[in-house]
Regions:
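Conserved SGNH/GDSL esterase-like catalytic core that processes O-acyl groups on lipids
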Residues: 64-172, 199-202
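N-terminal secretory targeting modules
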Residues: 1-101, 237
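Charged helix-capping and loop-helix junction motifs
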Residues: 167-176, 206-211
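Hydrophobic anchor at the start of a short beta-strand
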Residues: 124, 188, 223
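Catalytic His-Asp segment of secreted/periplasmic serine-dependent ester chemistry enzymes
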Residues: 2-7, 12-18, 45, 67-70, ...
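Active-site flanking residues adjacent to catalytic metal/cofactor-binding acidic residues
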Residues: 105-107, 191, 226
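Active-site segments of SGNH/GDSL-like serine hydrolases
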Residues: 155, 159, 177-208, 232-235
Length: 268
């Protein structure tokens, strides 16, 4: 792929268009290529925001505005993520769904799955929330009870690992979830945590150890464990075919995931 000399991305939607036109390229490679053009260094998407931050802190752009800007942007992003999280939890707690048979429970990898399209004839709901970890899922698991599902499909752990939580502490919280669902006559179906792509590869040894321990726990508790990694992240890494950003999944990956869990989406 080449980018024309002098081409400037004016907004985030143009970034989306660039990715759509070059769907074999990773997002990171496209951005690296774009910013390798000298003309674009002064025209990055957030440049005007950087100037605003500079003015707020009475700094020149030649000063430490970059650090200040990144700090301010981090606060804004965190606030936005928390706002979305709180709003979604509030909806799950207060906007009641009819009773269902199956619940998909997890973080963004679950949240962004097109489950209704993949299983149009199944009575299921999506209870994934982007950015969540096992602490948040423990807090949220109670809002699944009113749905009276037969089974809950769980994927969790990658955000905990990336946030530095120990495998032991994550598994302890995971076990609390499993015990909670079993005590309430809901069958938990555990899905392996997926490996990540090359840019996040430092997490993969932890994912491997985590999954091995999780599988042992499921065996002891007589809980179904579905190893998604065999198909979705073989060779202990998430291939570019299955992810554009080394973490979240492509449509083809969700289709493969759906086929792997289809045998469990039935009434026993």
């Amino acid at each position: 792929m080449t980018i024309k000399k002098g081409y400037v991305i004016e907004n985030e939607f143009e970034l989306y268009e660039m990715c759509a036109l070059n769907n074999s390229e990773s997002v990171f490679d496209l951005l690296a290529l774009y910013f390798s053009n000298e003309e674009n260094i002064k025209n990055k998407i957030l440049f005007n925001q950087a100037k605003t931050v500079a003015n707020d802190f009475n700094l020149s752009l030649e000063h430490d505005v970059i650090v200040k800007f990144c700090n301010a942007l981090s606060v804004l992003q965190t606030a936005n993520a928390m706002s979305q999280y709180i709003t979604k939890v509030d909806s799950h707690n207060n906007i009641r769904s009819e009773p269902v048979d199956f619940v998909m429970f997890g973080d963004s990898i679950t949240d962004w799955g097109p489950w209704y399209e993949l299983f149009p004839k199944k009575k299921l709901v999506n209870r994934g929330i982007a950015g969540d970890n096992t602490q948040g899922m423990l807090y949220r698991m109670g809002n699944i009870l009113p749905l009276n599902p037969k089974k809950v499909f769980i994927m969790a752990g990658i955000n905990d690992l990336s946030q530095g939580f120990s495998i032991k502490s994550i598994l302890k919280r995971y076990c609390k979830m499993l015990d909670f669902f079993q005590m309430n006559n809901i069958e938990p179906i555990v899905q392996s945590t997926l490996f990540v792509g090359k840019r996040l590869a430092a997490l993969n040894p932890l994912v491997l150890e985590f999954n091995q321990n999780l599988q042992d726990i499921c065996k002891d508790k007589k809980i179904s464990y579905i190893d998604l990694t065999i198909v979705l992240s073989p060779n202990n890494t998430l291939p570019s075919e299955h992810s554009r950003d080394n973490l979240h999944l492509t449509a083809i990956a969700y289709q493969k995931w759906a086929e792997l869990i289809r045998p469990w989406l039935r009434h026993d």
